[in-house]
């Protein structure tokens, strides 16, 4: 392994996202796959991570604990579940390891734990690691500043049947981008469900609608609707590799950073636009 490479560990290696993260880590220049993890008791423990991901033998055996691979990685990439990610966060904070967190569904306490840990380690925490989605978020900020005060804003998202949280983290990030551009707190203006007799739409709110069906990788639309016209800004993902490549790119970007909380807009330098 070349000293210039950054070594990544992949949590949830046997999952759909984990396998593609392994592929991305093996393919990206400047990155080395240092470790792969699965839950204790998994039948995948001991298998070769590259073969598990369909990328050929990598010489990295899947392990069941971070302690077993403590000296084998610099940055952990975690797209698992909130409770597991927070356990990994505590370990990485204690041992000075960077993290790329793509897990969604954190409550306020979980988000605060991430902010606290970033005082000691470098973390990229994002709801979505695709370049396209992060450009979308920037476009939404611009659109909201121009027409957000007088249009009806709705966010519609669709994902595969196995997704366990709703609305998606990306949909919430879209809402936060719009609300922030309007100097609002999303908690004060979001409407997450409508059923029965709801009365007329409340001005200034941001509505959310969720679809869960089939194998949809991820589709997100923000609608700014006025009388006589509307603008729709949409992103559609057709492969999880776009997220995997973005996450591994983020791990590479963390090289040399000691601490701090960042997102994909930092990685892509979109905040300067």
Swiss-Prot record:
SUPFAM superfamilies registered for this protein in UniProt: Glyceraldehyde-3-phosphate dehydrogenase-like, C-terminal domain, NAD(P)-binding Rossmann-fold domains
Subcellular location: Cytoplasm
Pathway(s) where this gene product acts: Amino-acid biosynthesis; L-lysine biosynthesis via DAP pathway; (S)-tetrahydrodipicolinate from L-aspartate: step 4/4
Keyword 4Fe-4S: no
Catalyzed reactions: (S)-2,3,4,5-tetrahydrodipicolinate + NAD(+) + H2O = (2S,4S)-4-hydroxy-2,3,4,5-tetrahydrodipicolinate + NADH + H(+); (S)-2,3,4,5-tetrahydrodipicolinate + NADP(+) + H2O = (2S,4S)-4-hydroxy-2,3,4,5-tetrahydrodipicolinate + NADPH + H(+)
The enzyme's E.C. designation: 1.17.1.8
UniProt-annotated binding residues for NADP(+): 39
Single GO MF descriptor: NAD binding
Gene Ontology terms: biological process: diaminopimelate biosynthetic process; lysine biosynthetic process via diaminopimelate
Active site, renumbered: 159, 163
Keyword Oxidoreductase: yes
Residues binding (S)-2,3,4,5-tetrahydrodipicolinate, per UniProt: 160, 169-170
Residues engaged in binding NAD(+): 12-17, 38, 102-104, 126-129
Keywords: Amino-acid biosynthesis, Cytoplasm, Diaminopimelate biosynthesis, Lysine biosynthesis, NAD, NADP, Oxidoreductase
GO cellular component: cytosol
Subunit record text: Homotetramer.
Family to which this protein belongs: Belongs to the DapB family.
Function: Catalyzes the conversion of 4-hydroxy-tetrahydrodipicolinate (HTPA) to tetrahydrodipicolinate.
Protein name per UniProt: 4-hydroxy-tetrahydrodipicolinate reductase
């Amino acid at each position: 392994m070349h000293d210039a490479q950054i070594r990544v560990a992949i949590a949830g290696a046997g999952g759909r996202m984990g396998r593609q993260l392994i592929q991305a880590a093996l393919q990206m220049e400047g990155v080395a796959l240092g470790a792969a993890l699965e839950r204790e008791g998994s039948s995948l423990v001991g298998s070769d991570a590259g073969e598990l991901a369909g990328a050929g033998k990598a010489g990295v055996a899947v392990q069941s604990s971070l302690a077993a691979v403590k000296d084998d990685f610099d940055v952990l990439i975690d797209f698992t579940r909130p409770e597991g990610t927070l356990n990994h966060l505590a370990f990485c904070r204690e041992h000075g390891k960077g993290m790329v967190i793509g897990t969604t569904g954190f409550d306020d306490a979980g988000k605060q734990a991430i902010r606290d840990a970033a005082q000691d380690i470098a973390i990229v925490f994002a709801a979505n690691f695709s370049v396209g989605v992060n450009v979308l978020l920037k476009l939404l900020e611009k659109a909201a500043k121009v027409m957000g005060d007088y249009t009806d804003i709705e966010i519609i998202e669709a994902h595969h049947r196995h997704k366990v949280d709703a609305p998606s983290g990306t949909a919430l990030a879209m809402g936060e981008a719009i609300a922030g551009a309007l100097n609002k707190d999303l908690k004060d203006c979001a409407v997450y469900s409508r059923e029965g007799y709801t009365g007329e739409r409340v001005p200034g709110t941001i509505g959310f609608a969720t679809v869960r069906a089939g194998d949809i990788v991820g589709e997100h639309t923000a609608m700014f609707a006025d009388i006589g016209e509307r603008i729709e800004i949409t992103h559609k993902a057709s492969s999880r590799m776009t997220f995997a490549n973005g996450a591994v790119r983020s791990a590479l970007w963390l090289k040399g950073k000691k601490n701090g909380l960042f997102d994909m807009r930092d990685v892509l330098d979109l905040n300067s636009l």
